[in-house]
Amino acid sequence: MMAMQLKDVCKMRESEPGHRAHDPRSFILRDLPWTIEKLKALPHFEFENWAVIALGGTPNVVQVGDMGIDGRIFPVGTKPNAKGGAMFADDWFPIQVKQIDKVGRPDIDAFEAVMEREGEGGRQRGFFVSFGFSSDAERECAAFHKRTGRLIKLITVQEILDEQHVQKM
């Protein structure tokens, strides 16, 4: 879609890598389109980064020992609590990413612990990305919400690819 607009509206031409330096009116398409198969083949940490960035989040700098948080989403309009406070205050949502076909209840249980542990009073909303989720995982998210009022949004990779995840945010 973007390539079509660049060609039709901006009258730019698609170029091969390395050729743009010679023609400033050209563009290079890179990393698109992703497919389920390509994403399954990515190294684990690259997949995590792809998913977090696709949600509009910030990936962790540290990949090992991340305490169950692969990235964070900072809500728009977040302001520091006080002068000299942290840039985004303490208002953020954790993202957990699993590069597996179906996340089960044990993974959701672990993420619930993360949401309860992080920050004063815990996190009110979190996002969990995977290729799929078991019905037990879905039921546990509903039960967790009923018990605590906290919300875990389950987002499949296909929903990200189809850009349907925006409605879940």
Q: What spans do the regions from the language model cover?
A:
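Mixed-charge (Asp/Glu-Lys/Arg
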Residues: M1-M169
